[in-house]
């Protein structure tokens, strides 16, 4: 059940969705409360209330993000970062979702394309914008939709979500620890094609170790890595 300022808004408990739209158009401060219904009995949750401030934007919450710095590839090309894929999970067991967000460089590439890419970052934020950690996938994970998928799920059933993704030598976890060989660089330097007067086959990664790593959702620490 959903309440606003103590007034019940739902005729029956919400059971088939994860959202509720309040048709109230007032711009005044409002306190919303979600009360779980278990076995037909309404209960309370310690973190079940949220205060919507006066004149709040409609339809969304603004969450400040920590954008990574721009970069330059070995070929001398510059790139910038923008928010990309995101998922949610309760990483610390407090009953509130956190956001796990991927930062993608502007020079990300598909499998069929050559060229260097910037490094990919995975961040975790609270809803108030507090950054909990950042994972750097490193130079040996190419940026692109086919390379950098991740999963957020409570794998061990402890009430805290873990984060799983493909990693490689040089990936840096949320505690600053490097996975594998920190000095490895498997990116192709490329060859010069006189007929095109340009470098070809640059930046592709066709060799080197690949890993699957489970990270702590709470700290970003690498918990277990397999190859």
Model-assigned labels for residue ranges:
Residues 2-4:
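Conserved aromatic beta-strand anchor motif in extracellular beta-sandwich/beta-rich domains
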Residues 7, 11-227:
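Beta-propeller-forming repeat regions
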